[in-house]
C-alpha cells in the first residue's frame, strides 16, 4: 500500500487507483474503486494555480484536466491540493476512487470553478462543502444529506428553499444571493441547538417568510440564528406567534421590518438607507 501521505503519479489510465505492493518491474497493481466526482471544471482566464482543500479518509485519484493524474491517501487532516495551469482554457476536474469517504470539499473561493452541484452526489460522507463565489449551478436538493456546513453564497444554484429539510445534521448554511426560488414549506428536522441559517437576498415573499418562521417554531431547536434580511419580503402579523415562540427559545432573527420609498407613508423612521430596517429578536 502507499506510505502515509505518499502520492504517486499514475499512467494514462486516468482515474484508476493504484494499490497493492509494487511488483518486480516497479509497477503497481490496478483496481477501479467505486465512485466518481465529475462535472466540475476550471474556466481558466488568467493562467496560474488553482487549489482545493480536501479532507477525509481512503484513497482517491485526482485528475486536474491537464493529462496527468496522481493518487492521494487521506489522513483526516485538512490539506491543500494545487495544480498550475500555464494556459487559459477549460480543465475538467475528475476525482475517482473512495470519494464516498471524502468529508470536506472547499473550493477556496475560486471564481473560475464551474459545473453542476450534482457532481457531489456520490460523496455520501460529505460534511463540509464550501463553494462560495464560484459559478456552480444546479438544484440544492441534489446535495448529499450528510452535510453539516454548506456555503453557497453568491453562486448560481437554485431550487426550493424547502430542500433544507433534507439535511438533518445541518449546523450552518449560507445561501445568500443565490437563485433559490421561494419556500414551499416542509417538516423541518430536529436540528442541533445553535444552528445558523443565512438566507439573505433571496427575494423571498412575505408568505415565504411567514411559513419559514412557522415551520421553525414547530421544531424544538433552541438558540439558533436566522438571517432573512436584505432583499427579502417583510414578514406579516401571521407569523407573530411563531416569531415570539422562537425568540423565547433564544433564537436571533434578522429580518426586514419596514419598507420605504420616497413619497411613501410606509417609512420606518430610523432607517438609515430609507429602504428597510432590520431587527434582531
Language-model features and meaning:
Residues 151-187:
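Eukaryotic tandem repeat interaction scaffolds
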Residues 2-136, 140, 145, 161, ...:
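N-terminal capping/linker segments that flank leucine-rich repeat
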Amino acid at each position: 500500500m502507499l506510505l502515509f501521505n505518499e502520492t504517486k503519479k499514475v499512467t494514462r489510465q486516468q482515474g484508476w487507483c493504484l494499490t497493492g505492493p509494487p511488483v518486480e518491474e516497479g509497477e503497481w497493481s490496478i483496481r477501479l474503486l467505486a465512485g466518481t466526482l465529475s462535472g466540475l471544471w476550471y474556466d481558466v482566464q488568467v493562467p496560474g494555480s488553482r487549489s482545493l482543500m480536501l479532507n477525509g479518509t481512503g484513497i482517491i485519484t485526482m485528475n486536474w484536466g491537464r493529462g496527468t493524474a496522481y493518487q492521494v491517501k487521506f489522513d483526516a487532516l485538512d490539506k491543500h491540493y494545487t495544480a498550475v495551469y500555464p494556459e487559459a482554457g477549460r480543465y475538467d476536474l475528475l476525482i475517482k476512487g473512495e470519494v464516498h469517504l471524502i468529508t470536506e470539499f472547499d473550493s477556496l473561493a475560486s471564481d473560475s470553478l464551474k459545473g453542476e452541484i450534482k457532481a457531489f452526489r456520490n460523496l455520501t460522507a460529505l460534511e463540509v462543502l464550501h463553494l462560495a463565489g464560484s459559478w456552480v449551478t444546479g438544484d440544492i436538493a441534489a446535495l448529499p444529506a450528510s452535510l453539516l456546513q454548506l456555503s453557497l453564497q453568491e453562486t448560481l444554484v437554485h431550487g426550493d428553499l424547502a430542500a433544507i429539510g433534507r439535511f438533518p445534521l445541518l449546523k450552518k448554511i449560507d445561501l445568500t444571493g443565490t437563485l433559490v426560488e421561494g419556500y414551499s414549506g416542509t417538516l423541518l428536522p430536529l436540528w442541533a441547538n445553535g444552528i445558523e441559517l443565512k438566507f439573505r437576498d433571496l427575494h423571498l415573499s412575505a408568505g415565504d417568510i411567514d411559513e419559514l418562521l412557522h415551520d421553525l417554531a414547530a421544531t424544538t431547536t433552541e438558540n439558533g440564528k436566522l438571517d432573512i434580511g436584505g432583499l427579502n419580503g417583510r414578514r406579516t402579523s401571521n407569523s407573530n406567534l411563531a416569531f415570539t415562540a422562537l425568540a423565547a427559545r433564544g433564537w436571533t432573527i434578522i429580518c426586514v421590518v419596514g419598507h420605504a420609498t420616497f413619497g411613501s407613508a410606509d417609512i420606518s423612521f430610523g432607517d438609515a438607507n430609507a429602504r428597510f430596517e432590520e431587527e434582531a429578536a
